[in-house]
């Protein structure tokens, strides 16, 4: 078993029942007795690299679980999923904005989440709210601690003025009962909260993410630099046949116009997504107003890209590090989840000898890793010694509960590093030892190590290469480990 276990996209690998068991109900406001919680599904790895917050209206958070596999795919890709209901809200008023901020701030504190790694998603009316909230975050950045890096909305009305016109048409048409009932409810609710449209149009415009008839950039201008996606079921034939809705009786015209305005403003990250499959509810009924119009795997891949979440499958290193036959490899972003205190940012690229996990092998615990570090971190013997202690101490600590290691077998992690004669091509070279618990055999162990440093002026990166083995320096394994370094090259741009 390797040091880290990466889980890639697994759309059908985990049954929905498993997610119900792993989903946590989190109370964020003890004073609110009506709707004071959200659902949280941490990633399988426990390593939260990003957060997707899914909002819905007119239902409880639990409603989402059988309707979409977005939480499933996020679970397998180091993304924390938060699901929150916005009750019967149709737009983002001041109270709702404050409530969303309270939820997001609670998530940051509860899960130690990075505020720069949030994406918001909303379904139908909650989608309109997610868009407007994101706009406000960039219109008044000083008032919000979380600024969404991406936002997407599913089958959502983006223009409240046009939504009222839709209500008028549906009530007059009086064809499909569901639409007529919704139109009456929405019309009454918006009139009650914003006033009559004819005399309060400005209130509707201010509350909308977008106003189609505006002659100048409106609220949408604050999405100019934000990745935005709008998802719609564009099967107009079905709308005409079953509900007597033309193209103009859907949310599609306004949604597509919003995306077009963003594209014209220079936002190349704005996308209109036409569903590849017809919208279906979990009960098997055809309905364009469904979470299922989102391709969950593709959406999470998009989120990972926009949130800058490392993916080994698509990683294109700026260096060459060989992989001998039979050796294992793992790559992940720094700092690792088991040693968050490490002052490193960048990528760790690991090479495991074939016998790394075999206690009977001469290659037991023989491995090497490259730290491809951003900028210019402090590197000297003392810093390396402290950081290795944090790294291996955290690694052992993470394995204690997993392997059920009894307390009487634990030993302190002790590191000793010194600077030695600089090897050819190195900026500096170090060597030393790591005394620790071998969590596989559950016995004390001393790892010998050689550390090479090389700076890359072209890429403003630093390469730190660590070689490890419990064998003495005269053992043949060190020749193999050192060969990895001597063949290491930084690619030219």
Task: Set out the residue ranges of the language-model regions.
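Alpha/beta-hydrolase active-site loop
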Residues: 91-112, 132
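Short, well-structured beta-strand
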Residues: 423-493
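N-terminal cap/lid segment of alpha/beta-hydrolase-fold proteins
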Residues: 20-46
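C-terminal catalytic histidine-bearing segment of alpha/beta-hydrolase fold enzymes
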Residues: 228-238, 249-314
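Short beta-strand element of the alpha/beta-hydrolase
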Residues: 47-58
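Primarily recognizes the serine-hydrolase "nucleophile elbow" in alpha/beta-hydrolase
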Residues: 109-110, 115-175
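Mobile cap/lid helix-loop segments that gate and shape the active-site cleft of serine hydrolases
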Residues: 59, 164, 168-221
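Conserved polar/disulfide-associated segments of primarily extracytoplasmic proteins
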Residues: 355-438
């Amino acid at each position: 078993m390797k040091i880290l276990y990466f889980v890639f996209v697994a759309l059908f690998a985990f049954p929905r029942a498993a997610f119900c068991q792993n989903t946590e109900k989190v109370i964020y406001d003890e004073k609110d007795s009506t709707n004071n919680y959200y659902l949280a599904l941490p990633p399988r790895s426990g390593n939260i690299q990003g957060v997707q917050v899914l909002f819905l209206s007119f239902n409880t958070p639990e409603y989402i679980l059988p309707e979409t596999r977005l939480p499933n795919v996020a679970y397998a890709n180091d993304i924390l999923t938060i699901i929150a209901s916005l009750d019967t809200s149709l737009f983002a008023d001041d109270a709702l904005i404050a409530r969303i901020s309270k939820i997001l701030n609670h998530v940051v504190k509860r899960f130690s989440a990075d505020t720069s790694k949030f994406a918001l998603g909303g379904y139908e009316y909650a989608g309109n709210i997610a868009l407007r909230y994101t706009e406000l975050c960039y219109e008044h950045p000083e008032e919000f601690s979380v600024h969404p890096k991406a936002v997407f909305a599913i089958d959502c009305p983006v223009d409240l003025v046009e939504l009222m016109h839709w209500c008028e048409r549906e009530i007059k048409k009086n064809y499909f009962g569901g639409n007529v009932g919704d139109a009456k409810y929405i019309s009454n609710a918006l009139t009650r909260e914003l006033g009559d449209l004819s005399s309060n149009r400005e209130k509707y415009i201010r509350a909308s993410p977008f106003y189609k008839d505006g002659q100048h950039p409106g609220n949408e201008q604050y999405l100019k630099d934000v990745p935005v996606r709008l998802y719609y079921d564009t099967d107009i034939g079905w709308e005409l046949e079953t509900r007597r809705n033309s193209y103009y009786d859907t949310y599609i015209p306004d949604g597509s116009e919003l995306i077009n305005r963003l594209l014209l403003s220079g936002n190349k990250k704005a996308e209109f997504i036409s569903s590849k499959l017809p919208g279906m509810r979990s009960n098997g009924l055809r309905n364009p107003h469904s979470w299922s119009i989102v391709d969950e795997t593709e959406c999470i891949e998009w989120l990972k890209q926009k949130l800058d979440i490392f993916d080994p499958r698509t990683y294109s290193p700026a260096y060459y590090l060989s992989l001998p036959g039979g050796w294992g490899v793992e790559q992940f972003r720094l700092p690792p989840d088991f040693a968050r205190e490490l002052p490193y940012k960048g990528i760790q690229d690991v090479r495991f000898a074939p016998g790394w996990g075999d206690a009977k092998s001469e290659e037991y615990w023989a491995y090497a890793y490259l730290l491809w570090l951003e900028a210019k971190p402090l590197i000297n013997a003392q810093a390396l010694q402290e950081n290795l202690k944090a790294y291996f101490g955290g690694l052992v600590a993470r394995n204690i509960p997993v392997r059920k290691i009894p307390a009487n077998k634990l030993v302190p992690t002790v590191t000793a590093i010194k600077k030695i004669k600089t090897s050819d091509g190195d900026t500096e070279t170090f060597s030393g030892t790591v005394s620790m618990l071998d969590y596989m055999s559950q016995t004390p162990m001393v790892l010998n190590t050689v550390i090479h440093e090389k700076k890359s002026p072209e890429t403003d990166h630093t390469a730190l290469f660590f070689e490890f083995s419990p064998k003495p320096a005269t053992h043949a394994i060190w020749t193999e480990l050192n060969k990895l370094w001597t063949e290491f090259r930084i690619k030219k741009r």
